[in-house]
Curated annotation (Swiss-Prot):
Keywords recorded for this protein, A-Z: ATP-binding, Cytoplasm, Ligase, Nucleotide-binding
Primary localisation category: cytoplasm
Reactions this protein catalyses: a 3'-end 3'-phospho-ribonucleotide-RNA + ATP = a 3'-end 2',3'-cyclophospho-ribonucleotide-RNA + AMP + diphosphate
Name of the molecule in the record: RNA 3'-terminal phosphate cyclase
BP-aspect Gene Ontology terms: RNA processing
Location of this chain's protein in the cell: Cytoplasm
Family: Belongs to the RNA 3'-terminal cyclase family. Type 1 subfamily.
Role according to the record: Catalyzes the conversion of 3'-phosphate to a 2',3'-cyclic phosphodiester at the end of RNA. The mechanism of action of the enzyme occurs in 3 steps: (A) adenylation of the enzyme by ATP; (B) transfer of adenylate to an RNA-N3'P to produce RNA-N3'PP5'A; (C) and attack of the adjacent 2'-hydroxyl on the 3'-phosphorus in the diester linkage to produce the cyclic end product. The biological role of this enzyme is unknown but it is likely to function in some aspects of cellular RNA processing.
Active-site residues, Swiss-Prot/TrEMBL: H316 (tele-amp-histidine intermediate)
Source taxonomy: Bacteria, Bacillati, Cyanobacteriota, Cyanophyceae, Oscillatoriophycideae
Amino acid sequence: MLDIDGSWGEGGGQILRTTLSLSAITGQPIRLYQIRAGRQKPGLSAQHLTCVRAAATICNAEVRGDKLRSTLLEFIPTRPPQAGHYTFDVMDAQEGGSAGAVTLILQTILLPLAIASEESTVILKGGTHVAWSPPISYIEQVYLPLLSKLGLQTELHLQAWGWYPQGGGEVHLHIKGNCQLQGVELLERGALKQVKGLAVVTELPSHIPQRMAMRCEKLLQQAHVKGYVQPLRAKGVAPGAGVFLTSEYEHICAGFAALGRRGLPAESVAQNAVEQLLSFHQQDAPVEEFLGDQLLLPMILAQSPSQYRVAHISEHLKTNVQTISQFGLAQIDLNLEDRLVFVKPGHNLT
């Protein structure tokens, strides 16, 4: 059994998600201890517990420690990941807490199901647009399109918006199995073709998304960036608001999000999102910071090496390198000065 310290590095839930994915894929039993030990509320939250149960379901794992606030987990797969029709609901684990992010569950089970022998359909219920996690709009516009370049084929449909803390969102994901991933090189992003976005609210007046969209477009215009932001008023189980922007470059896309909250003007939400976008645009890296650590897992499973240049080598990225290295599946090297990441899958090691 492989022992992994969940408090290492930035010590967050990413260690858990990466470990679960690789355990399911390789069949390697793991013992994860000190889970999220440095957090204000250590241990497994509802979204982390749902990740555990989802990963266990697809590989029929024997699990010990799968309860809220647990800081110790044993996870023993008994079969390779199995394709199928699955439904995972964060509310099943929340016990009065907030609705966690379905995108984190998606990223936990995506690659195990992609290498399964058949197609899979997954329904995820909970928070679709939640702070401190990638919103489903980012997954749809940035993450999955890039993985398609590696050879992973998916279809994603947002059925209902779900905000923190009520949740109530729903996502349908179709994953084509038997995936053979190929490495990629992401060193140049090319020219900016356009910026597109969505300013959305649920259960709030229609003037709010209109104000957010207008403010976004005005700020982009002032920066001499062409962009169109669509205002949208949708139905949901609770009020919520957000701006989701995508910068489309010649070779890659980058995504940026800002969520509304009570008392925060619509224009401030828009400005937050645009400032993130312009800050990245002023750099020359093709891969933005948050995508940087999310690319490692698919790249170590590819048939050929990958390399990419990232806007910032974050603690999340360094922590993910450390977590992955314990499975011995790849050689990952970081060039801190040039912000380069080199990934050499295990079957390419000499």
